[in-house]
Amino acid sequence: MVEIPVSLGELIDKITILFIKRKYINDFDKLRNVNQEYDLLITKWKSLKEYSEESLGHLVTSLANVNERIWFVEDAIRDHERRQDFGEDFIKLARSVYTLNDERANIKRQINLRLGSQIYEEKSYAKYKD
């Protein structure tokens, strides 16, 4: 295992994604790996001086909700791909991925600001709305 520095928002994001995987993955071997990673990251998070469930409650919940929506959108896109159905619904789903990811990045930034993270993830995409 290698340890790398990441922003606090990125750590919490990863934990929320692993939590979602724990809910929806049924394959025993995959679930064992997910649980192992989840346990390692939760332990790391709780050991940090910045750890505080109280100050982040609504942000963590919002991040988990966005990540779960992304999970369902990605599943729906794959269903359309399997059926070779690239109509209006497929386009709407595909377009929602970047708006959801923008929302996700915003919440991660709020977490980083709230906790005074030393690392901040930066995004740089062309504006698509005013």
Predicted regions and their residues:
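Extended, charge-rich alpha-helical interface modules
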Residues: 1-130
